[in-house]
Each structure stands twice: as C-alpha cells, then as structure tokens.
UniProtKB/Swiss-Prot annotation:
<keyword id="KW-0964">Secreted</keyword>
<dbReference type="GO" id="GO:0090729">
    <property type="term" value="F:toxin activity"/>
</dbReference>
<keyword id="KW-0738">Voltage-gated sodium channel impairing toxin</keyword>
<protein>
    <recommendedName>
        <fullName>Venom peptide 7.1</fullName>
    </recommendedName>
</protein>
<dbReference type="GO" id="GO:0005576">
    <property type="term" value="C:extracellular region"/>
</dbReference>
<dbReference type="GO" id="GO:0017080">
    <property type="term" value="F:sodium channel regulator activity"/>
</dbReference>
<comment type="similarity">
    <text>Belongs to the non-disulfide-bridged peptide (NDBP) superfamily. Short antimicrobial peptide (group 4) family.</text>
</comment>
<keyword id="KW-0872">Ion channel impairing toxin</keyword>
<keyword id="KW-0800">Toxin</keyword>
Amino acid sequence: RLRSKGKK
C-alpha cells in the first residue's frame, strides 16, 4: 500500500 502509515 502507498498511503498506509497507520491511519485508516
């Protein structure tokens, strides 16, 4: 995943 730093 690209935008998965820990949010949602």
